[in-house]
C-alpha cells in the first residue's frame, strides 16, 4: 500500500469538509494568516481518539449490491444509509433521484458538520501549525520535491503558502483537498447532499466533530507520515488511480471491496517498507473505518429511532464484517439493498 493509494481509500470514507480544510482555512484571513511578528502561539491539544482492540477485517462480509440501503426495525420509521464519495467531476450536478431521497427524509446526517464555527476553525488551524518548520523535518531536497509535486495540482496555492508551517499529519490531511483539473470537491456526493438539504431547509446533523477526525490523523507517527509523503512524490498519480471513482460513478459497487482490499495489500513498487505499508493499512482500516464506525453506531441508532433519516457516509464505512451494514444487523436492524442510486445527473 503506497500513499497515492491511501488518498483513494480516504476518498471512499468521505471526510467531507475536512477534505476542503486546506483550501478554506489557508486563504489570507486576519485570524488565520501566518503572523510575521513573534508572538506566543496558542497551542491546541487534540484529544486522544477512542481506541478499540484490533479486529480482523473481512472486506467481503457484505456484497455491496448498491450504494443505498434501507434501515428497518419494528416500531421505528425506515431510514436510509447512502455510501458516498467526496470527489466529483467538475460541474457535475445532483440527480433528481438523490434530491428526492433528501426530500422524503426528515433529517440529513453526514459524517461531520458542514458549518464550521469560527472558534472551531481557529482550533483546527492552531492544531495543524507546528513550531518546527517542515523543511527542517524533511530536509531541503525532499521538501522541495514535495512542493513541486503539490504545485502540479491546479488548486494547490493555498497549501503551498503555508506548507512549511504545518505538522506532517496536517500536510497529509491537506493533500486530500488537491484535485486534478477535471475533479471537484464541491461536486462530491456529501457536499451536494449538504447543499440540497440546505436548499430544502432540512434539519441536519453529524456523526462526529472535525476535531474528533483530526485526532485520528494525529496518532500517525511523524516519521511514517514523512515517508508516506516522500512516497507520494516518487510515485505520481496514474490513470489507474481513477478506477475506484469510476467504479462508484458507474454503479459498479460490488467491485469496490476487492479494489479497496487490493490497495491495502503490499505494493512492491512503493518506496515504503513492508512494515510501513502495513502501518498505513492498519491505520486506515482499524482507525479510520472500524473505530469510527463503532463510535457512530449509537448515534445512528438514536437518530433512526426518532425520524426517517438519511445517513450519508463514505462507501468504505458500509463494507466488511465491521462495516455499518453488519453492525446494524448485529444490533437488531434489517438492512436491505435498494435499487442503485445515481447521485449525479
Residue locations for each model-derived region?
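Generic N-terminal leader/processing signal
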Residues: 2-5, 18, 36-37
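Hydrophobic alpha-helical membrane-insertion segments, chiefly the h-region
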Residues: 15-25
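Ser/Thr/Pro/Gly-rich low-complexity linker/stalk segments immediately outside membranes or between
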Residues: 26-40
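Structured, acidic catalytic/metal-binding patches in enzyme active sites
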Residues: 40-59, 65-280, 284
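Short secondary-structure boundary/capping elements
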Residues: 63, 93, 291-295
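A cross-kingdom marker for long, charged
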Residues: 278-345
